[in-house]
């Protein structure tokens, strides 16, 4: 395993469902979907936490984290306390718990140390789920290569060469990431009649209204774009909400005889400021994550998702629609 940057991982605790559990879930499926849409992450089944971390003793916190560890799931773990993603001291109690788990699990102390993240609060990068990940490093046929200490110099015909060693490999699985949230759109040469491109508009970072439209680019409607919950929610729920909202907008446009939909510049400015304000009230900006574009050299460092929660975002979008699509400019002739 060639590791550049350690990330936190918690157990998935996947398990087979009994026939009774499966039947009950299918019977109540619609209720589960409706519940999910009322939650911040778009994922139901996780009661929101009622306590702040400092309200528990160290022993009680350890018991709480232990219970979440054995329950499994990243949402469940981050729901141990109300302030894990907003208070650095609270977050550090969760970090310390997971680091202790790594020490207890991985027999080689040096390898264990390499696997312990020390550069970001837990949950501010996508929290990984695993089945026996840390236990894997106790196997005789598994080696961890710390490429910060021994960087990769080249790929060879038979494997990978680092500054110090050569590794013969049958297969290489890349986990190097991608240009999230804006990369696919900016790969398309989207231009308006005056010649300005979307690349020009977003040169200092993406700017949208609700993550759905960007001022000056009429009739360009974006699905789960920057400025919306997008990757910080259940993507199915996020996509469906956007598609439904755009469908209703199109019906409104057609009924009114409009030809063009655009974002009001002032509404966009206020939304961008709101997205940044919400992000700054959390610990997310403290991580060099792909949420900020940190994995792409030269990409502007802008926190792209809206992290107030899918539930709050849906309410905002519904309110915009109920008020004649406030913040949008509708025209009966294309400019």
Task: Label the model's feature ranges.
Residues 1-335:
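N-terminal FAD-binding dinucleotide-binding subdomain shared by FAD-dependent oxidases/monooxygenases
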């Amino acid at each position: 395993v060639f590791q550049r940057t350690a990330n936190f991982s918690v157990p998935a605790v996947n398990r087979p469902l009994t026939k009774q559990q499966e039947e009950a879930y299918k019977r109540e499926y619609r209720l589960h979907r409706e519940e999910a849409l009322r939650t911040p992450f778009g994922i139901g089944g996780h009661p929101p936490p009622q306590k702040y971390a400092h309200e528990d003793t160290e022993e009680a916190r350890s018991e709480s984290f232990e219970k979440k560890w054995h329950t499994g799931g990243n949402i469940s773990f981050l729901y141990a306390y109300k302030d894990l993603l907003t208070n650095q001291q609270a977050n550090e109690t969760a970090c310390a718990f997971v680091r202790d788990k790594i020490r207890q699990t991985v027999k080689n102390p040096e390898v264990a140390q390499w696997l312990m993240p020390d550069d970001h609060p837990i949950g501010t990068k996508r929290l990984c789920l695993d089945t026996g990940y840390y236990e894997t490093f106790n196997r005789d046929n598994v080696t961890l290569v710390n490429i910060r200490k021994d960087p990769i110099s080249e790929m060879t015909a038979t494997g990978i060469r680092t500054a110090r060693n050569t590794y013969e490999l049958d297969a290489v699985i890349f986990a190097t990431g991608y240009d999230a949230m804006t990369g696919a759109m900016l790969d398309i040469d989207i231009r308006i009649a005056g010649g300005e491109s979307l690349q020009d508009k977003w040169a200092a970072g993406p700017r949208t209204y609700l993550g759905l439209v960007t001022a000056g680019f009429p009739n360009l409607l974006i699905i789960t774009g920057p400025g919306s919950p997008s990757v910080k929610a259940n993507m199915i729920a996020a996509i469906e909400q956007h598609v439904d909202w755009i469908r209703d907008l199109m019906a409104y446009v057609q009924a009114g005889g409009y030809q063009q939909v655009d974002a009001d510049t002032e509404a966009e400015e206020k939304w961008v400021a709101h997205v940044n304000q919400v992000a700054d009230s959390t610990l997310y900006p403290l991580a060099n994550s792909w949420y900020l574009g940190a994995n792409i050299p030269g990409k502007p460092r802008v926190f792209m998702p809206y992290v107030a929660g899918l539930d709050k975002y849906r309410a905002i979008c519904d309110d915009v629609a109920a008020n004649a699509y406030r913040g949008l400019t509708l025209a009966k002739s294309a400019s």
